[in-house]
């Protein structure tokens, strides 16, 4: 039982926006479903200033995997209620030769991560005319470590450890992700408490990636998968990109 998900990319008319990605696939009931995706990378881009590297291709791939993982509900798109076979078609990448070299490794690693079978079909991207204005500037040499900051207890402990481990006058760069809103509230609550109580003052900055399904953009209302197994991949990709 293979589900083929077509990736559609629509370029933006403005350099302020990266463009829009959407998914299209045949539903379990035979009806074609489409959904648009959020992919707001402005804060990450303000640090890396990059849309042409293999790291950016990996970020795009990870964002798409995360959204496909959410869109394809296990109990409807698998024989046993869990293990899905998903083919992602027309994944746009800048560095297609490098991505094809890594294709088998990507598939094996993500199959292990989510417990599914994934097949990736890459196509050559024409690139992105993305250069948003009103972005902060960063001095990269001020940062000694990157810490993935979800707002959960494990990532909070990792952040605290990093902040105490780094050299004097250096900072930790926190990388966060939000989709549903609750994640951001948890992250903000923690950092607001740090600020109000002068905890780790001057020891960190945070960049937020807003990526996920646009819930009101489904062509046909669909229940989404809630196991979030691929979210860690998106975090790693965002950290590598930054």
Model-derived regions, located:
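Conserved adenosine/adenylate-binding substructure
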Residues: 144, 214-242
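Hydrophobic positions on the alpha1 helix immediately C-terminal to the Walker A/P-loop
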Residues: 154-158
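Short, glycine-rich nucleotide/cofactor-binding loops
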Residues: 147-153
